Amino acid sequence: MQRVPMTKGGLVRLKDELRRLKSVERPKIVKEIAEARAHGDLSENAEYHAAKEKQSHIEGRIAQVEHWIASAEVIDVTKHAGDRVVFGATVSLEDAESGDQVTYRIVGELEADLKQGKISVTSPIARALIGRSEGDTVVVRSPGGEKEYEIQSVAFVEEELPTESE
């Protein structure tokens, strides 16, 4: 089994999703199937077929999340130190052209969320940053062209772990 690098927070979110799927979504769909089945003839029962399709989707998602959890390799970012960019680092950059500042945290593919400033370790920006240090200038090659950044800072901080979902 190929190991999937992940932060502690990413693993917590996956476990929370699995708990929600098993304890909320699965029982809810079982109830919907039972109610639809009570309406009679299953061959022409659109509610029943829709509920069974939804159940299949939920069971598939449960299997997928269980696989991700089983193959997770949790990287403790607090064990890193120094100014070299590695998985889990929070990196502040300055756009060499515009002077704009941006901060990214390098995470596993399953955790990436640009809106939260989390970029995949396999993204063009992360690939350009890995192994570099504070003060280095990096050129990021992406489908949109080349962009130059200067690494302002590299930090290794534990992200705030998510709380249990509602």
From Swiss-Prot:
Keywords of the record: DNA-binding, Transcription, Transcription regulation
Signal peptide: none
Record-linked Pfam families: GreA_GreB, GreA_GreB_N
Coiled coil regions in record: none
Family: Belongs to the GreA/GreB family.
Function text: Necessary for efficient RNA polymerase transcription elongation past template-encoded arresting sites. The arresting sites in DNA have the property of trapping a certain fraction of elongating RNA polymerases that pass through, resulting in locked ternary complexes. Cleavage of the nascent transcript by cleavage factors such as GreA or GreB allows the resumption of elongation from the new 3'terminus. GreA releases sequences of 2 to 3 nucleotides.
HAMAP family noted in UniProt: GreA_GreB
Protein name: Transcription elongation factor GreA
Gene transcribed to yield this protein: greA
